[in-house]
Amino acid sequence: MSALDAYKIRQDFAILDQVVNDEPLVYLDNAATTQKPQVVLDTLMAYYHEDNANVHRGVHTLAERATAAYEASREKLRQFINAKSTKEVLFTRGTTTGLNWVGRFAEQVLEPGDEVVISIMEHHSNIIPWQEACKKTGAKLVYAYLKDGQLDMEDLANKITKKTKFVSLAQVSNVLGCINPVKEIAKLAHQVGAYMVVDGAQSAPHMAIDVQDLDCDFFTLSGHKMLGPTGIGVLYGKEEILNQMNPIEFGGEMIDFVYEQEATWKELPWKFEAGTPNIAGAIALGAAVDYLSALGMENIHAYEQELVDYVLPKLQAIDGLTVYGPENPTQHAGVIAFNIDGLHPHDVATALDYEGVAVRAGHHCAQPLINHLGISSAARASFYIYNTKEDCDKLVEAILATKEFFNGTL
């Protein structure tokens, strides 16, 4: 049994107490965004009520308190991912921003004939920046494909060559739910002198992250997918690499000195944080990290595995329902994409909503993967710390009711 008590955890999330379409809300769209515990909401309000001031600028009391809280949150994030230094922890708007920043760095170093290796399962945020970087530099974008609903490691290893300059992969697929062995892949990348980039949007909220152990060169995460506010995230980069990177945005507070014709930059991490940052979001993300750390990331991962072990076989047993990704629950994170024969995923999601069950339907910002699977879209249920086995049962019951309803109307 897991050390987590989901029923106790749910008490911290007032939003989950509501009724939707005369049914208790079952929120299973956590891969899109997570709900926020009361302590995160309180932290946001406390900043605006008590400490609202700009950071790194003023010497008055409010400014000093805001700056201290902002930088304390950076230290919490450093510990959360086990970076060596807060110099390696850059606040961003989210994973998309972080990957775009890495893409801009790639434009500095890529040359014609170089290659960037990604996988077919990537989120658009880990595809388009590389497409653009390759277009601008004459480099080539190379895809690794799937085997049995997972990354084909043999194919990936064959694609990583002396031409490879970047390897960029999601640690957990936001559609297939498979967990990619990024530590092993980082070794392959470094053997040929390539940079290893990890999209941690779907992994950082759900498992312990140690960027030093992974030996990745970059790692990105989004606060809103791990109980924090929207509009805040982190890009981790090894200090020696970040020192090589040009600033992405220019303006206030990222400068050391501005002359009439040129300027010099501050040291890390501030040379990448131009303008007034999302101060409240960063501080509240620190509160979210405190909340998750108190539960224990190992406990969170183990509990979510219990839910997957419980619900995945039930879904696989439903006649006419196809689950995408690994068949073995132990290889499947808490993201389950599926389709029902003869039904459009949007109709399925709408019908489930009538039963109070919130899931997502669409291409999940992964159109190359969806095309590769030979489908146009899929429904997706995704789980988190406040979900229960009763939520799993409700999902299965709602799917069966949906099938029965549409079978009666077709």
Task: Tell me the role of every PLM-derived stretch.
Residues 1-410:
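Pyridoxal 5′-phosphate
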